[in-house]
């Protein structure tokens, strides 16, 4: 969410009960594939309580939101440096009304549901980063073979070779982490 970053307590999208509906207000940013999706899983604050130490805590719940729901819209796509095949957009909720039966799981347990889901996606993000690193290494090798300085390709210089060896070692090490 804007201004929340990774702070779960920074959640600002709220869901309030209204008869047989939930009404969502707020926004989400950097949502992967938002430009293509027709159905979204949205985490919103449903309850404000005190934790065991008496501190205010927000309890979140998960909801199914459809692109055609009234009060829901998708913002413009982000202009990203990479991973352009994935449309990353903002989601906007302005009195977005969804039926009560579209809550996923248990009220107040949406954050746990989101974390369990995100854990499964982390390997995909790591794989994308590794692919980008491998591509950058390939492009760099091609460039240093082509670029001339002092009458020869810069690939012939020992310092360039040291740097390429370091890049290659880091990419290979990353493969074992993924």
Residue ranges and their predicted role:
Residues 2-4, 29-35, 82-83, 119-124:
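Glycine-rich phosphate/pyrophosphate-binding beta-alpha loops
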Residues 8-10, 36-37, 58, 86-88:
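Short, solvent-exposed loop/turn segments at the edges of secondary structure
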Residues 15-16:
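A structural signal for short hydrophobic beta-strand segments in well-ordered beta-sheet cores
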Residues 19-23, 39, 88:
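A generic structural signal for beta-strand entry/edge sites
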Residues 25-74:
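A short core secondary-structure module
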Residues 72-173:
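Glycine-rich beta->alpha junctions and the first turn(s) of the following alpha-helix
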């Amino acid at each position: 969410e804007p201004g929340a970053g990774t702070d779960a307590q920074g959640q600002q999208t709220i869901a309030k009960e209204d008869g047989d509906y939930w009404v969502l207000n707020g926004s989400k940013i950097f949502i992967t594939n938002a430009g293509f999706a027709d159905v979204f899983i949205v985490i919103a604050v449903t309850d404000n309580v005190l934790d065991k130490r008496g501190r205010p805590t927000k309890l979140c719940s998960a909801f199914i939101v459809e692109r055609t729901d009234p009060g829901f819209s998708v913002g413009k796509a982000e202009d990203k440096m990479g991973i352009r095949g994935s449309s990353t957009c903002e989601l906007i909720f302005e009195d977005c009304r969804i039926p009560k039966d579209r809550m996923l799981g248990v009220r107040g347990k949406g954050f746990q549901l989101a974390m369990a889901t995100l854990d499964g996606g982390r390997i995909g993000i790591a794989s994308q980063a590794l692919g980008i690193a491998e591509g950058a290494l390939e492009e760099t090798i091609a460039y240093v073979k082509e670029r001339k300085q002092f009458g020869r390709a810069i690939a012939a210089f020992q310092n360039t070779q040291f740097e390429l060896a370091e890049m290659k070692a880091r990419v290979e090490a990353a493969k074992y982490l993924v």
